[in-house]
Curated annotation (Swiss-Prot):
Recorded name of the encoding gene: rnc
Domain DRBM: 154-223
Molecular-function annotations in GO: double-stranded RNA binding; metal ion binding; ribonuclease III activity; rRNA binding
GO annotation, biological process: mRNA processing; regulation of gene expression; rRNA processing; tRNA processing
Primary enzyme class: hydrolase
Protein name listed in UniProt: Ribonuclease 3
UniProt organism field: Aliivibrio fischeri (strain ATCC 700601 / ES114) (Vibrio fischeri)
HAMAP family: RNase_III
Length: 223
């Protein structure tokens, strides 16, 4: 195996017996030939099961609704993309020229899909218990810190519920600035919230993320 992939193996905590599984997991459909989408499908199902099983045993008194919300938080694309960045996965992806040029190695969806594909690849290269152990090692900190209840709602939802519960008007979000090229933009949002003297400013790589950032800051100031 080449030294580059060996470095990645150390980061993910698994050494492949068959290098071709890892290479396939890192190959986006924009690259010519076979790509990682079948592995992604497999990995998505495995991840969902492993996380659901852990939550079931970790929280014996929590109902189905809260467990579903916790699982959704843990397996959503944003969380998977965070894992991908922790592994510096963008440095190892095989992308077509168009995706390379547009910064695909930084895109949340591509990183998240590759993480799921790696899970599928590890399963095919090993067995159920091995892939379970790898997933739980990746998620250890997140599983230790997650709690049932309101924390699983996103900041915009929590801010809205906070204001509604106090019979206050809903916040308004306005884009005040968009910086950068189309594939690598930064949005600045101004959020006006009843009860706060000044508008709250949030920034993010999309309008939605900037709004969530502003809502999170507003909640911190209100509480």
């Amino acid at each position: 195996m080449n030294s580059s992939l060996q470095r990645l193996e150390k980061k993910i905590g698994y050494q492949f017996k068959d290098e071709s599984f890892l290479k396939l997991a890192l190959t986006h459909r924009s690259a010519n030939g076979t790509h990682n989408e079948r592995l992604e499908f497999l990995g998505d199902s495995i991840l969902s099961f492993v996380v659901a099983d852990d939550l079931y045993h970790r929280f014996p008194k929590v109902d189905e609704g809260d467990m579903s919300r916790m699982r959704a938080t843990l397996v959503r694309g944003h969380t998977l993309a965070e894992l991908g960045r922790e592994f510096q996965l963008g440095d190892y992806l095989y992308l077509g020229p168009g995706e390379l040029k547009s910064g695909g190695f930084r895109r949340d969806s591509i990183l998240a899909d590759a993480v799921e594909a790696i899970i599928g690849a590890i399963y095919l290269d090993s067995d159920t218990e091995t892939v379970r152990g790898i997933i739980l090692s990746w998620y250890n900190t997140r599983l230790e810190s997650i709690e049932p209840g309101v924390s699983q709602k996103d900041p915009k939802t929590r801010l809205q519920e906070y204001l509604q519960g106090r019979r206050k008007p809903l916040p308004t979000y306005t884009v005040t600035k968009i910086k950068g090229e189309a594939h690598n933009q930064e949005f600045t949002i101004e959020c006006i919230v009843a009860g706060l003297d000044k508008p709250v400013i949030g920034k993010g790589s999309s309008r939605r993320k900037a709004e969530q950032s502003a809502a999170d800051i507003a909640l911190g100031q209100l509480n």
